[in-house]
Amino acid sequence: MGTVRSRRLWWPLPLLLLLLLGPAGARAQEDDDGDYEELVLALRSEEDGLAEALQHGATATFHRCAKDPWRLPGTYVVVLKEETQRLQPERTARRLQAQAARRGYLIKLLHVFHDLLPGFLVKMSRDLLELALRLPHVDYIEEDSYVFAQSIPWNLERITPARYRADEYQPPNGGSLVEVYLLDTSIQSGHREIEGRVMVTDFESVPEEDGTRFHRQASKCDSHGTHLAGVVSGRDAGVAKGASLRSLRVLNCQGKGTVSSTLIGLEFIRKNQLVQPVGPLVVLLPLAGGYSRVLNAACQRLARAGVVLVAAAGNFRDDACLYSPASAPEVITVGATNAQDQPVTLGTLGTNFGRCVDLFAPGEDIIGASSDCSTCFVSQSGTSQAAAHVAGIAAMMLSAEPELTLAELRQRLIHFSAKDVINEAWFPEDQRVLTPNLVAALPPSTHGAGWQLFCRTVWSAHSGPTRMATAMARCAPDEELLSCSSFSRSGKRRGERIEAQGGKLVCRAHNAFGGEGVYAIARCCLLPQANCSVHTAPPAGTGMGTRVHCHQQGHVLTGCSSHWEVEDLGTHKPPVLRPRVQPDQCMGHSGASTHASCCHAPGLECKVKEHGLPAPQEQVTVACEEGWTLTGCSALPGTSHVLGAYAVDDTCVVRSRDVGTTGNISEEAVTAVAICCRSWHLAQASQELQ
């Protein structure tokens, strides 16, 4: 698709009626590329037209890319509400065309979505946006925008666990039970690396190239796609050497595509899945554009249908949350590292980072198939290559355990990653705590990991600076929220709590007056057959503090949190020389409400670990022993200079203000409290399967 704008045409009524009643108005016309299009100029009655539309308030919203050079004004994705019927997108599109015709505009209907999301793609004048937003059933409209390829043999050694490394790469399986869809440029399927492993589909939806009116031949435009196909499943340089690939062309010869083309490609995959259900599917999205609500929504729909999506974080040395599909929570988002496990730098740019990145993977000077000849190889760099590595690892994990859910796969990828190997100084200071220090690696064995209690840390977006501002973090649908904490760089916060929203528990953090904003931090775990609840004690007002415990029989404590309404709890000095938290009890400041997260699950046992220091420290940590998993992390209790607490792998970290910058030296204790759990039931079930 190009960026051709619709033109406003004033039609004399007799001529308009002639067009409608004649053959030219009754049949579709062919556009310049030979595609079949329909120009509807039908007049409809006032009762069924604008008058009806204007009765409805414009409750729909309009979205567009935040980066102006990437925008495609004149092309729009109109998304309808989820409860609309299957035929409603066509009806709404034709209603819009009819109402536009009465105003002298032509609208070109480019595509109708059914299987991915209810909606349609149109080319029209921006003048018609208000009219379209007022149509019944419309949820939101998004202006189309560009997406870009993200590429500018140490890599195979790097993803092999250290104690299993040999002179050559020996993966546990080839990923042969998994099909990988690659949305990219075209592919040279005859290259010896991927010959017989790639099926080039007939799907092609790409924009015109800059500076030319005509597309180049696809065979001359397959460098990026061929290289990535080789990284995923190449005979010599591939990660999952047995995985089969299907290629969809959504990027042109310049490595440029559009959001709408990507949407149509994802719908193509969903249609194939419905028509011919197969084994596990992995979709590799080695592209990035500006934040797109509709693209993220499409990824969510596909993920909930059982498809694993792996995306490049982006090569803009920026927060990955500003780009799509990297910002979609249901997507496994991958940043890039080099042979020294450091973030990849690409000229003045480099890998994206931040809370939307799940993990990093090799992405610099990656050797792979070249489109120059059927036996040529080439080196490429970028988060596209990093994402291809993770797609290959995912294929092998799914081949070993085809029933893995997306949540289970993501947790395993995180658990088996190499930890704390990246130099965080490369990232902006405000992003270091948010960016995972994880580099992807194959598990020692693709079997037998089921006994582990897997947990991960999920950070919210930063809240606003107002006193009543809040931040919210949530877990994936298949995960349990076992604890909630908060963090503020200024230290001005009012704590956190777990609350129910839409049938799921969420973690909500509260900013304080004069604060710069706050983060909510959820600890999300895989705990089958769990029954979890939250017990709250109001502020005690006096005494040593507010206490609450798990009073239901068989429930164990998995997390503690507190929140308060006052701006400053003041100082509170709990004793340091004796244990302060019982195995089933939380303690908070006497002026705070305290919450205990309590769970019952077969074989679940938990214990509390503490580490306290009598003088202010910038950081205090306490870790769980091997075989135990951190489910809760909190600071004890309510010290005025504590910035917050958060989990890093199985370590609880409590951060405090630098006393050198505050000018005040306090003798308040800083205590980190970790709740460590394990499940005997999971271990027993895993042994029975082996």
From Swiss-Prot:
Query: Which residues have a glycan attached per UniProt?
Result: 531
Q: Which residues carry this modification: Phosphoserine?
A: 45, 686
Q: Which GO terms describe its biological process?
A: apoptotic process; cholesterol metabolic process; low-density lipoprotein particle receptor catabolic process; proteolysis; regulation of neuron apoptotic process
Description of its domains: The C-terminal domain (CRD) is essential for the LDLR-binding and degrading activities. The catalytic domain is responsible for mediating its self-association.
> What's in the GO CC field?
cell surface; cytoplasm; early endosome; endoplasmic reticulum; extracellular space; Golgi apparatus; late endosome; lysosome
Predominant cellular place of this UniProt entry's protein: cytoplasm
The text of the family note is: Belongs to the peptidase S8 family.
Q: Organism, per UniProt?
A: Lagothrix lagotricha
Q: Under what name is this protein listed?
A: Proprotein convertase subtilisin/kexin type 9
Proregion span(s): 29-150
Record-annotated Inhibitor I9 domain positions: 75-147
Q: Quaternary structure?
A: Monomer. Can self-associate to form dimers and higher multimers which may have increased LDLR degrading activity. The precursor protein but not the mature protein may form multimers. Interacts with APOB, VLDLR, LRP8/APOER2 and BACE1. The full-length immature form (pro-PCSK9) interacts with SCNN1A, SCNN1B and SCNN1G. The pro-PCSK9 form (via C-terminal domain) interacts with LDLR. Interacts (via the C-terminal domain) with ANXA2 (via repeat Annexin 1); the interaction inhibits the degradation of LDLR.
Q: Which GO terms describe its molecular function?
A: apolipoprotein binding; low-density lipoprotein particle binding; serine-type endopeptidase activity; very-low-density lipoprotein particle binding
Cited Pfam families:
Inhibitor_I9, PCSK9_C1, PCSK9_C2, PCSK9_C3, Peptidase_S8
On the tree of life, the source organism's domain of life is: Eukaryota
Residues carrying Sulfotyrosine: 36
The prosthetic group or cofactor this protein requires is: Ca(2+)
Signal sequence span is 1-28
Role description = Crucial player in the regulation of plasma cholesterol homeostasis. Binds to low-density lipid receptor family members: low density lipoprotein receptor (LDLR), very low density lipoprotein receptor (VLDLR), apolipoprotein E receptor (LRP1/APOER) and apolipoprotein receptor 2 (LRP8/APOER2), and promotes their degradation in intracellular acidic compartments. Acts via a non-proteolytic mechanism to enhance the degradation of the hepatic LDLR through a clathrin LDLRAP1/ARH-mediated pathway.
Question: What InterPro entries does the entry give?
Answer: PCSK9_C1 (IPR041254), PCSK9_C2 (IPR041052), PCSK9_C3 (IPR041051), PCSK9_ProteinaseK-like (IPR034193), Peptidase_S8/S53_dom (IPR000209), Peptidase_S8/S53_dom_sf (IPR036852), Peptidase_S8_subtilisin-like (IPR050131), Peptidase_S8_subtilisin-rel (IPR015500)
Q: Which residues form the Peptidase S8 domain?
A: 153-459
What is this enzyme's EC? 3.4.21.-
Record PTM text: Cleavage by furin and PCSK5 generates a truncated inactive protein that is unable to induce LDLR degradation. Undergoes autocatalytic cleavage in the endoplasmic reticulum to release the propeptide from the N-terminus and the cleavage of the propeptide is strictly required for its maturation and activation. The cleaved propeptide however remains associated with the catalytic domain through non-covalent interactions, preventing potential substrates from accessing its active site. As a result, it is secreted from cells as a propeptide-containing, enzymatically inactive protein.
What gene is this protein a product of?
PCSK9
Region described as C-terminal domain: spans on this chain: 448-690
Which keywords does the record carry? Apoptosis, Autocatalytic cleavage, Calcium, Cholesterol metabolism, Cytoplasm, Disulfide bond, Endoplasmic reticulum, Endosome, Glycoprotein, Golgi apparatus, Hydrolase, Lipid metabolism, Lysosome, Phosphoprotein, Protease, Secreted, Serine protease, Signal, Steroid metabolism, Sterol metabolism, Sulfation, Zymogen
